[in-house]
Amino acid sequence: MKRKDIVKLSRRDFERAWLESGKSLRKPHHDMQYPRLRFETGKSHVLYDTIWMIREAYLRLGFSEMVNPLLIDEEHIYRQFGPEAPAVLDRCFYLGGLPRPDIGLGTGRIQMIEDMGIDVSDEKLENLKEVFRSYKKGDLSGDDLVLEVSNALEVESHDGLRVLERVFPEIRDLKPVSGRTTLRSHMTSGWFISLQNIHDRYRMPLKLFSIDRCFRREQKEDSSHLMTYHSASCVVVDHEVPLDVGKAVAEGLLEHLGFSRFRFRPDEKKSKYYIPGTQTEVYAYHPLLKEWVEVATFGLYSPIALSMYGIDQEVMNLGVGVERVAMILNQASDVREMVYPQIYGEWRLSDRDIAEMLRINLHPVTSDGRMLMEKIVKTWRAHADAPSPCSFEVYSGEFLGRRIEVSALEVEENTRLLGPAVWNTVYIHDGNILGVPPGTELDSELITRARKEGLNTGITYMEALAAEAAYRIEEMVVSGAEEVEVRSTIARSLSDLNLTLEDTAMRYITGKNREIDLRGPLFSTIRCRLRG
């Protein structure tokens, strides 16, 4: 009954109309059925989730956010660390750059340019010399060198590039030279520079925080060390700042992250930018982990280091390693795997992921085709165990503008219309794709587990084979053929069942030594003939 007829009927007989509305439901296209149909949200990275939580905690504690300098001249390391500076600089990355060489234009080079088929006039030579002078002085960036050389010689960019490669190889062979600028290895380097500029511009106390990258030249990266990490650092600046401020800030910050109960222990490292005896490690107890873990360090900046920047206030600094906290909160054992799961992490596809990538290959595309598919399934279900030889009419009538006659048959003697495997349903369990029969008599251990714990894809062998038969009949009618017979015998692989699996899932199953076991006897035959 059509929708408008149901609405009309409801005015006379609501109950009957309501029941009829249930009959109007059509089975959706295979790709619009669960678990193929899936609505997913984007996934955030655990590291940035942790940064956001720490950032929110600082803001709730009344701290204002700041971005500290990332590029630090080595002079600041000496001012902050004193005689300890060389050891600190050993773990710093120095920035290097390519030098700007003097590039001469001798007779030999001019001849080489002319040999490349480029006309060289006095004006062009003068323009080229000016380009190289600007490059040497730094007025011209390396990005624009090819373009400017091409303009000077009045040639296309690809010819200008050939000139640079063949005539001026010294540009290609340049080696980087290090300067005095380092990448920030710890947030303290940036805090001293920032506080130097603002300590006398605001009312005390100052409560500031910064969450940003630091870089440390570790001997190697391992499960607990990366060469770049995030520091969630804060400072409290006032005329007088007791060490207990660090304890209170640590407590307020870490309680927001789910930690409870805190222990404070003197840090044995004793960095020279802290007042002796103030550098303190913070240990916190996490109820979910049920253990004590080190999560932060704080201390009071040394008046000697502060005096190097003209700062006469007292400063408490607390630092939290974001990766460390993220590992604790997510119970990760390897920081590389946590930060770079795409490189170090184990490749995992859930059964749900695989189910989304498994689908019927050939599926009817028209409403007539989908109707015929349902009739094939209905006929098979009704007569699957009929003794052969046998034949049953599936449909006789109009189909895509032509009259057809469709039958389900088995011509061999002493068998049945269908093989027993047609009743199987496809399950996915622990990465294995399995054909699970309706009965339990022949279950293997793997099939038993799949039946209890696996994901039912909703795909039956019968429906997959019926979909292919209906699709082939659509093809027959559209192409003008007179007859088609679709027969399936033994299922050994996905293609035997008219199923397809995306390459990603296939690589995963193969790489993880999982199984695709869909074997079974099918022996189904559908025949279609045109009738005018």
Swiss-Prot record:
Top-level class of the enzyme under EC nomenclature: ligase
Purpose of the protein: Catalyzes the attachment of O-phosphoserine (Sep) to tRNA(Cys).
UniProt: substrate binding residues: 186-188, 231-233, 273-274, 317
Keyword ATP-binding applies: yes
Keywords for the protein's UniProt record, in alphabetical order: Aminoacyl-tRNA synthetase, ATP-binding, Ligase, Nucleotide-binding, Protein biosynthesis
Family the entry assigns: Belongs to the class-II aminoacyl-tRNA synthetase family. O-phosphoseryl-tRNA(Cys) synthetase subfamily.
EC number assigned by the record: 6.1.1.27
Molecular-function annotations in GO: ATP binding; phosphoserine-tRNA(Cys) ligase activity; tRNA binding
Catalytic activity: tRNA(Cys) + O-phospho-L-serine + ATP = O-phospho-L-seryl-tRNA(Cys) + AMP + diphosphate
Subunit structure, as described in the record: Homotetramer. Interacts with SepCysS.
Pfam families xrefs: SepRS_C, tRNA-synt_2d
The protein's name in its UniProt record: O-phosphoserine--tRNA(Cys) ligase
GO biological process: translation; tRNA aminoacylation
